[in-house]
A protein has these predicted regions:
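Exposed beta-sheet edge and beta->alpha loop/turn motif
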Residues: 98-159
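Short, low-complexity N-terminal intrinsically disordered segments enriched in polar/charged residues
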Residues: 21-49, 57
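Tryptophan-centered motif/residue detector
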Residues: 49-50, 143
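Sec-dependent bacterial lipoprotein signal peptides
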Residues: 1-24
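Intrinsically disordered, low-complexity segments enriched in polar/charged residues with Gly/Pro
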Residues: 8, 32-33, 82-85, 120-124
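Short solvent-exposed beta->alpha transition segments
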Residues: 37, 52-106, 110-114
């Protein structure tokens, strides 16, 4: 009788632990992953369509100088190119790599049909497709893009 009660208790505990694990998921990082994906999408759409003021709400406070720098390098020739583009830039989220501490992540995206800033004094040029890795971190409980420089495209491996 005692063995039956202990066995029943063990089954009940296992069921409760399984339920708790299922309900909480196996999330090993902080913050809301949906919020992260939505905000990286919004940031990238605004950034790669050169709407820099709209990107601020998706970035850490320390990122603001980089956005101001990007905006200060826009010239009339760049604006004219933006206006003549047939389509806006679009993005795809390829991967999200969370750090071991769960408070930082690197998001891999592919950007299509965007104007790439060139060196200072040169006109921007149209790029059909490029990959970027954007760092993110938790700020006040919310995922934010953490700019430590302007986003630079990664080289593609064309094996």
């Amino acid at each position: 009788m005692v063995k039956k009660t202990i066995f029943s208790m063990a089954i009940a505990v296992a069921a409760i632990l399984t339920s708790v694990y299922t309900l909480t998921g196996c999330q090993s990082h902080q913050g809301d992953e949906n919020q992260l994906e939505n905000d990286i999408d919004s940031f990238a759409i605004y950034y790669f369509n050169w709407q820099f003021p709209k990107t601020l709400k998706y970035c850490t406070q320390s990122s603001e100088p980089w956005l101001r720098y990007a905006a200060s390098n826009v010239h009339q020739a760049d604006v004219d190119l933006l206006r003549t583009k047939a389509e806006d830039a679009t993005i795809e989220i390829n991967d999200i790599d969370f750090s071991d501490d769960g408070a930082n992540a690197t998001v891999s995206i592919t950007v299509h049909n965007f104007l790439q800033m060139d060196t200072i004094g040169q006109e921007a040029h149209l790029v059909e497709e490029a990959d970027f890795h954007l760092p993110m971190s938790i700020e006040n409980g919310v995922w934010k893009i953490r700019m430590v420089n302007l986003p630079r495209s990664e080289r593609r491996n064309h094996d």
